[in-house]
Curated annotation (Swiss-Prot):
GO BP terms in the entry: glycerol catabolic process; glycerol metabolic process; glycerol-3-phosphate metabolic process
UniProt GO cellular component terms: cytosol
Superkingdom assignment: Bacteria
Gene giving rise to this polypeptide: glpK
Catalytic reactions on record: glycerol + ATP = sn-glycerol 3-phosphate + ADP + H(+)
Keyword list, A-Z: ATP-binding, Glycerol metabolism, Kinase, Nucleotide-binding, Transferase
First-tier enzyme category under EC: transferase
Regulation: Inhibited by fructose 1,6-bisphosphate (FBP).
Binding annotation for sn-glycerol 3-phosphate: 13, 83-84, 136, 246
EC numbers, comma separated: 2.7.1.30
Family: Belongs to the FGGY kinase family.
Species assigned in the record: Francisella tularensis subsp. mediasiatica (strain FSC147)
The protein's name in its UniProt record: Glycerol kinase
Gene3D superfamilies with a match to the protein in the record: 3.30.420.40
Length: 502
């Protein structure tokens, strides 16, 4: 039977998804199932690792059944996943010793504070992992499990426990324990992997007291990791041939293969990644250095910046203020006026991310006069999303010395044409919106397809990724500079507010 399809396994923070793609990049079927979010204490977030596997294997079978695709028609599987979330399990039984600790979980903040008391070690971590010391990353989460779960430390020291990010857990289960591996992109998010030597970092492992025997083998993002066990998917042994963290897979799905190419994902927040080539670039502007993907043992590096509040500001003006009935209405109101008339909205509801990193900043609306109307506030909210993206992308330009070679966009907010046009104006750069919405899944299947010869090269991938719309700058650079100065002044007003007035 001909192998006409590739299956994307897209394991996210709130749901497990499976997407079947054909050779032209068309979607045959999507299946999705949400799973339980566990909050044992304030600031703690967990997932049931067995529920993750159960929902993920379930949607894979569902996509095949309802897409009318037989398992032996699948040429390969590509995995993309929520990053940093980590699981520790028993090597013999395959049972987790504790729930998965999710990337959002802040329980290891005190461990991070302890590390930060040693500035030289903090510097070492940044220079060798590309990351800042934060509870966000996997390393301190593993330490917490070993220190707090009864018997875990002893078992780990005896070589009886394994750890892995979500991709590793899925590979382990898909192969029935035959393969314990991760890819370079996911490894680079653990705070345990040296992105220069491309090995697990012994100095950091020793500091956190994590036995190296627990760690998975690190493989290329585009490579056959192993095959599914014959009992997993209807008797078929399907190659698992592509693996990447979700934001990395999106960069690959956007075909950002050249240095200077960047993508921005507009979700609740924003994640911007720029391809910086075959050598790591370290940021002076608060960005993270990461491995985008690796092929044939050669990594491609990226800079990453995150904005905490993007699409969430539209939810706020809808649900909190009642200024619009639906998110789609925001575009209608924003286009009823020519400008915000000097009004700026800084959505620092939970502080500010890149490049400000101010946890005490708070939301601010400035420039209000007696003439300010609902439309001005709505438009200012949309413009704030674009200004924050510009903040991040300007940092990338500063760190790399590269001009932005256009911006590829995805996520829910890209359906707002006003926002995309304003983003193009404020960046003075072309914005490309692809026809396909499932860019993360597409990136995973692109990686898998290249590994098994389903597609021959990246040039063929570029022909599959078709553009729905291109936005070109329509404002002159002087007007843009004037507006951006106003944004910067507004941000200054929002800084340290909770610290000063709590």
């Amino acid at each position: 039977m001909s192998k006409d399809f590739i299956l994307a396994v897209d394991q996210g923070t709130t749901s497990s998804r499976a997407i079947i793609f054909d050779k032209k990049g068309n979607i045959r079927k999507i299946a999705q199932k949400e799973f339980t979010q566990i909050y044992p204490k304030s600031g703690w977030v967990e997932h049931d690792a067995m529920e993750i596997w159960g929902t993920q294997s379930g949607v894979m079978r569902e996509a095949l059944e309802f897409g009318r695709v037989k398992p032996d028609q699948i040429a390969a599987i590509g995995i993309t996943n929520q990053r940093e979330t980590v699981i520790v399990w028993d090597k013999e039984t395959g049972d987790p010793v504790y729930n998965a600790i999710v990337w959002q979980c802040r329980r290891t903040s005190s461990i991070c504070d302890e590390i930060k008391r040693d500035p030289q070690f903090v510097k070492y971590i940044k220079e060798n992992t590309g990351l800042v010391v934060d509870a966000y990353f996997s390393g301190t989460k593993v330490k917490w499990i070993l220190d707090n779960v009864e018997g875990a430390r002893e078992k780990a020291n005896a070589g009886k426990l394994l750890m892995g990010t979500i991709d590793t857990w899925l590979i382990w289960n898909l192969t029935r324990g035959k393969v314990h591996a991760t890819d370079y992109s996911n490894a680079s998010r653990t705070m345990l992997f040296n992105i220069n030597s491309l090995e697990w970092d012994k100095k950091i492992l020793d500091y956190l007291n994590i036995p190296e025997s627990m760690l998975p083998e690190v493989k290329n993002s585009s490579e056959v990791f192993g095959v599914t066990d014959s009992h997993t998917l209807g008797g078929a042994e399907i190659p698992i041939a592509g693996v990447a963290g979700d934001q990395h897979a999106a960069l690959f799905g956007h075909c950002c293969f050249e240095k200077g190419m960047a993508k921005n994902t507009y979700g609740t927040g924003c994640f911007a990644l720029m391809n910086v080539g075959d050598k790591p670039v370290y940021s002076d502007e608060g960005l993270l250095t990461t491995i985008a993907w690796a092929e044939n043992g050669k990594p491609t590096y990226a800079l990453e910046g995150s904005v905490f509040i993007a699409g969430a500001v539209i939810q706020w003006i809808r649900d909190g203020l009642g200024l619009v009935r639906s998110a789609e209405d925001s575009e209608y109101y924003a286009t009823k006026i020519d400008s915000t008339n000097g009004v700026y909205l800084v959505p620092a509801f939970v502080g500010l991310g890149t490049p400000y990193w101010d946890m005490y900043a708070r939301g601010t609306i400035v420039g209000i006069t007696r003439d300010t109307k609902r439309e001005h506030i709505i438009r200012a909210a949309l413009e704030a999303i674009a200004y924050q993206a510009k903040d991040v992308l300007e940092c990338m330009k500063e760190d790399t010395g590269l001009d932005l070679a256009g911006l590829r966009v995805d996520g829910g907010a890209v359906q707002n044409n006003f926002l995309m046009q304003f983003q193009s104006d404020i960046l003075q750069s072309e914005i490309s919106k692809p026809k396909i919405n499932e860019i993360t899944g597409l990136g995973a299947v692109f990686l898998a397809g290249l590994a098994v010869g389903f597609w021959k090269d990246k040039q063929e991938l570029k022909s599959i990724l078709t553009t729905e719309k291109v936005f070109e700058p329509q404002k002159d650079s002087q007007a843009v500079a004037h507006d951006y100065r106003g944004w910067k002044k507004a941000v200054e007003r929002s800084k340290a507010w909770a610290e000063c007035y709590s």
